[in-house]
């Protein structure tokens, strides 16, 4: 059984209000030294059999179609990542 991890992040030019809220809260909680926070989504997909190039292409297509908004988000799919 193979596994693919899909990470969905806002494109760099898109403002991230949730990330900004976390960044603003960090010093209030005693965590200093952070200059930026970006929030995203992570999906772990288990596939039957080995992860081939065809399977990875299908995962990327599904991620672009279903798991993300390609207008404002970027998708990265990695085979077998922890």
Residue ranges and their predicted role:
Residues 1-82:
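Non-catalytic terminal accessory/regulatory regions of metabolic enzymes
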């Amino acid at each position: 059984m193979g596994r693919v991890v899909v990470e969905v992040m806002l494109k760099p030019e898109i403002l991230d209000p949730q990330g900004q809220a976390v960044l603003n809260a960090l010093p209030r909680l005693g965590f200093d030294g952070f200059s930026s926070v970006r929030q995203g989504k992570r999906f772990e997909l288990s596939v039957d059999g080995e992860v081939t190039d065809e399977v990875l292409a299908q995962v990327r297509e599904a991620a672009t179609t279903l798991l993300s908004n390609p207008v404002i988000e970027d998708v990265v799919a990695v085979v077998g990542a922890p």
